[in-house]
């Protein structure tokens, strides 16, 4: 499964987010309840399938004697996770804490990131993607990624 593209949505007054059909169907395909692990990072919410979240969390368990900064990072990411299920209407309810962290009020954008997807406030995402990414092509090339645009 691969999450791709952007989908612009609005929360309802109760903080529920209607997932795009392709996202909803992908979640229901891997979990009958449409479970998703939603955590905080980079000023947005990051959603993982149950299997991918278990792998991610297991990676932290393998770190022996983590630094204070790593433990603080773990507190942010693992401590910020909430397990959600897609309701019968294809929605997930965002918590107040998650909405505050990501600056979400009403308008959101769901952004595919391959094995996971992100939920951004529309304003925050516009600021992020409005950056100059000219130097990123050098970083891609140094990593062996050909990006011929």
Swiss-Prot record:
Organism (species): Oleidesulfovibrio alaskensis (strain ATCC BAA-1058 / DSM 17464 / G20) (Desulfovibrio alaskensis)
Which domain of life, per UniProt? Bacteria
Family matches, as PANTHER family: TRANSCRIPTIONAL REGULATOR MRAZ
Q: Which InterPro entries match?
A: MraZ, MraZ_C, MraZ_dom, MraZ_N, MraZ_sf, SpoVT-AbrB_dom, SpoVT-AbrB_sf
Quick one: a GO cellular component term?
cytoplasm
One example of the protein's molecular function in GO is:
transcription cis-regulatory region binding
SpoVT-AbrB domain span: 6-52, 81-124
Matches recorded under Gene3D superfamilies: Transcriptional regulator MraZ domain
Swiss-Prot/TrEMBL keywords? Cytoplasm, DNA-binding, Repeat, Transcription, Transcription regulation
Listed under subunit, the entry gives: Forms oligomers.
List this protein's GO terms for biological process: negative regulation of DNA-templated transcription initiation
Query: What SUPFAM superfamilies does its record include?
Result: AbrB/MazE/MraZ-like
This protein is called: Transcriptional regulator MraZ
Similarity comment text for this entry: Belongs to the MraZ family.
Lineage at the top is: Bacteria, Pseudomonadati, Thermodesulfobacteriota, Desulfovibrionia, Desulfovibrionales
Location of the protein in the cell: Cytoplasm, Nucleoid
């Amino acid at each position: 499964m691969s999450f791709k593209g952007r989908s612009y949505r609005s929360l309802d007054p109760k903080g529920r987010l209607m997932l795009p059909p392709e996202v909803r169907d992908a979640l229901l395909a891997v979990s009958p309840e449409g479970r998703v692990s939603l955590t905080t990072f980079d000023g947005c919410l990051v959603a993982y399938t149950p299997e991918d979240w278990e792998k991610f969390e297991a990676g932290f368990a393998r770190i022996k004697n983590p630094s204070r900064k790593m433990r603080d990072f773990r507190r942010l990411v693992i401590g910020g996770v909430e397990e959600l299920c897609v309701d019968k209407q294809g929605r997930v309810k965002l918590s107040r804490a998650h909405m505050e962290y990501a600056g979400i009020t009403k308008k959101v954008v769901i952004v595919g990131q391959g094995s996971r997807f992100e939920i951004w406030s529309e304003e925050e995402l516009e600021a992020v993607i409005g950056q100059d990414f000219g130097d990123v092509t050098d970083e891609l090339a140094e990593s062996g990624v050909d990006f011929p645009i």
